[in-house]
Amino acid sequence: MRLFLSLPVLVVVLLMILEGPVPAQGAPEAVDASSGLDKLKEFGNTLENKVREFFSRIKESDIPTKTRNWFSETLQKVKEKLNIES
């Protein structure tokens, strides 16, 4: 049982050793607050435009109507099979 548990641990340790040292991380760039806010605002505007375009495409498509009709027809069939009146 010990051998069964120690083999995976040994493999993980060997992989860590063979991987070598972790590369040094670069110093974070000094970004002033205004450029960070500008990037955030640009991202927000882009996201807003994409979401508006997505919802306008859905409104213009016939998918919601087809889906609503399909659910209505399916519900009607189930009611007929169960003899439920509404």
Curated annotation (Swiss-Prot):
Highest rank taxon of the organism:
Eukaryota
Name the keywords, alphabetized: Lipid transport, Secreted, Signal, Transport, VLDL
Q: Where in the cell is it found?
A: Secreted
The UniProt record lists the keyword Transport: yes
Q: Which residues form the signal peptide?
A: 1-26
Recorded GO molecular functions are:
fatty acid binding; phospholipase inhibitor activity
* InterPro entries assigned: ApoC-1_sf (IPR043081), ApoC-I (IPR006781)
Other remarks in the entry? Apolipoprotein C-I is present in acidic (APOC1A) and basic (APOC1B) forms in P.paniscus, P.abelii and P.troglodytes and perhaps also in baboons and macaques. The two genes for ApoC-I arose through a duplication process that occurred after the divergence of New World monkeys from the human lineage. In human, the acidic form has become a pseudogene sometime between the divergence of bonobos and chimpanzees from the human lineage and the appearance of the Denisovans. Pseudogenization resulted when the codon for the penultimate amino acid in the signal sequence was changed to a stop codon.
Give the record's family classification: Belongs to the apolipoprotein C1 family.
Identify this protein by name: Apolipoprotein C-I
Q: In which organism is this protein found?
A: Cebus capucinus
